Protein backbone atom coordinates (compact mmCIF):
# COMPACT_ATOMS: atom_id res chain seq x y z
CA UNK A 1 0.00 0.00 0.00
CA UNK A 2 1.27 3.47 -0.87
CA UNK A 3 2.02 5.90 1.95
CA UNK A 4 -1.04 8.01 2.70
CA UNK A 5 -0.69 11.78 2.72
CA UNK A 6 -2.95 12.40 5.69
CA UNK A 7 -2.57 16.16 5.36
CA UNK A 8 -4.65 15.91 2.19
CA UNK A 9 -7.44 14.55 4.40
CA UNK A 10 -7.23 17.37 6.94
CA UNK A 11 -5.05 15.66 9.53
CA UNK A 12 -3.41 18.49 11.45
CA UNK A 13 -2.14 17.64 14.94
CA UNK A 14 -1.90 21.36 15.75
CA UNK A 15 -5.55 22.08 15.01
CA UNK A 16 -8.20 22.02 17.73
CA UNK A 17 -10.82 21.25 15.06
CA UNK A 18 -8.89 18.14 14.00
CA UNK A 19 -8.67 16.94 17.61
CA UNK A 20 -12.41 17.51 18.07
CA UNK A 21 -13.06 15.22 15.09
CA UNK A 22 -10.48 12.68 16.23
CA UNK A 23 -11.85 12.52 19.78
CA UNK A 24 -15.43 12.18 18.50
CA UNK A 25 -14.37 9.38 16.12
CA UNK A 26 -12.55 7.55 18.94
CA UNK A 27 -15.55 7.94 21.26
CA UNK A 28 -17.87 6.56 18.59
CA UNK A 29 -15.48 3.65 17.98
CA UNK A 30 -15.40 2.88 21.71
CA UNK A 31 -19.19 2.65 21.71
CA UNK A 32 -19.11 0.20 18.79
CA UNK A 33 -16.60 -1.97 20.66
CA UNK A 34 -19.22 -2.57 23.34
CA UNK A 35 -21.37 -4.43 20.83
CA UNK A 36 -21.32 -8.21 21.04
CA UNK A 37 -18.56 -9.76 18.97
CA UNK A 38 -19.67 -12.07 16.18
CA UNK A 39 -19.02 -15.78 16.72
CA UNK A 40 -17.25 -16.54 13.45
CA UNK A 41 -13.70 -15.28 13.02
CA UNK A 42 -14.47 -14.09 9.48
CA UNK A 43 -17.37 -12.00 10.82
CA UNK A 44 -15.19 -10.60 13.63
CA UNK A 45 -12.64 -9.48 11.03
CA UNK A 46 -15.36 -7.89 8.90
CA UNK A 47 -16.71 -6.04 11.95
CA UNK A 48 -13.19 -4.89 12.87
CA UNK A 49 -12.63 -3.53 9.36
CA UNK A 50 -16.09 -1.96 9.18
CA UNK A 51 -15.52 -0.26 12.54
CA UNK A 52 -12.38 1.30 11.08
CA UNK A 53 -14.28 2.34 7.94
CA UNK A 54 -16.77 4.17 10.17
CA UNK A 55 -13.92 5.67 12.23
CA UNK A 56 -12.32 7.14 9.09
CA UNK A 57 -15.69 8.39 7.81
CA UNK A 58 -16.14 10.19 11.13
CA UNK A 59 -12.59 11.56 11.04
CA UNK A 60 -12.06 12.60 7.42
CA UNK A 61 -15.58 12.54 5.99
CA UNK A 62 -17.49 9.78 4.28
CA UNK A 63 -16.41 10.69 0.74
CA UNK A 64 -12.73 10.85 1.68
CA UNK A 65 -12.96 7.61 3.63
CA UNK A 66 -14.56 5.84 0.67
CA UNK A 67 -11.85 7.17 -1.63
CA UNK A 68 -9.09 6.13 0.78
CA UNK A 69 -10.47 2.67 1.53
CA UNK A 70 -12.16 1.70 -1.75
CA UNK A 71 -9.53 -0.89 -2.67
CA UNK A 72 -8.81 -2.11 0.86
CA UNK A 73 -10.06 -5.65 1.49
CA UNK A 74 -11.57 -6.76 4.78
CA UNK A 75 -8.17 -7.68 6.17
CA UNK A 76 -7.21 -6.80 9.74
CA UNK A 77 -3.53 -6.30 8.87
CA UNK A 78 -4.41 -3.79 6.13
CA UNK A 79 -6.49 -1.70 8.52
CA UNK A 80 -3.82 -1.94 11.22
CA UNK A 81 -1.25 -0.60 8.74
CA UNK A 82 -3.52 2.30 7.77
CA UNK A 83 -4.10 3.19 11.42
CA UNK A 84 -0.36 2.96 12.12
CA UNK A 85 0.19 5.35 9.20
CA UNK A 86 -2.30 7.83 10.70
CA UNK A 87 -0.62 7.64 14.11
CA UNK A 88 2.82 8.09 12.50
CA UNK A 89 1.59 11.22 10.75
CA UNK A 90 0.19 12.64 13.99
CA UNK A 91 3.41 11.77 15.85
CA UNK A 92 5.56 13.39 13.16
CA UNK A 93 3.43 16.55 13.14
CA UNK A 94 3.64 16.84 16.93
CA UNK A 95 7.41 16.26 16.86
CA UNK A 96 7.82 18.96 14.19
CA UNK A 97 5.73 21.35 16.29
CA UNK A 98 7.97 20.67 19.30
CA UNK A 99 11.12 21.20 17.21
CA UNK A 100 9.72 24.45 15.83
CA UNK A 101 8.91 25.92 19.23
CA UNK A 102 12.25 24.74 20.66
CA UNK A 103 14.02 26.50 17.80
CA UNK A 104 12.02 29.68 18.37
CA UNK A 105 12.76 29.63 22.08
CA UNK A 106 16.43 28.95 21.48
CA UNK A 107 16.63 31.83 19.04
CA UNK A 108 14.46 34.45 20.71
CA UNK A 109 14.00 33.67 24.40
CA UNK A 110 16.02 35.82 26.78
CA UNK A 111 19.23 34.26 28.00
CA UNK A 112 18.60 32.63 31.31
CA UNK A 113 20.28 29.97 33.29
CA UNK A 114 20.10 26.80 31.22
CA UNK A 115 19.43 28.72 27.99
CA UNK A 116 22.82 30.28 27.27
CA UNK A 117 22.34 29.84 23.53
CA UNK A 118 19.29 32.09 23.37
CA UNK A 119 19.45 35.41 21.59
CA UNK A 120 20.33 38.36 23.78
CA UNK A 121 17.52 40.67 24.79
CA UNK A 122 17.50 44.26 23.61
Residue spans for each PLM region:
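A generic structured-segment signal
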Residues: 35-36, 41-73, 79-85
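Intrinsic-disorder/low-complexity regions
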Residues: 1-7, 11, 19, 63, ...
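Residues that form generic nucleotide/phosphate-binding pockets
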Residues: 25-28, 32, 59, 71, ...
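Short N-terminal mixed-charge amphipathic segments
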Residues: 1-43
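Alpha-helical structural motif
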Residues: 14, 18-25, 48, 52, ...
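C-terminal charged interaction modules
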Residues: 66-122
Amino acid sequence: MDEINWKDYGVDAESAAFWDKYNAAVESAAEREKEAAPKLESDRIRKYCNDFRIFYADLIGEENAEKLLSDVPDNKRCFDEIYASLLRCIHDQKAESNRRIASILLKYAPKTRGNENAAPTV
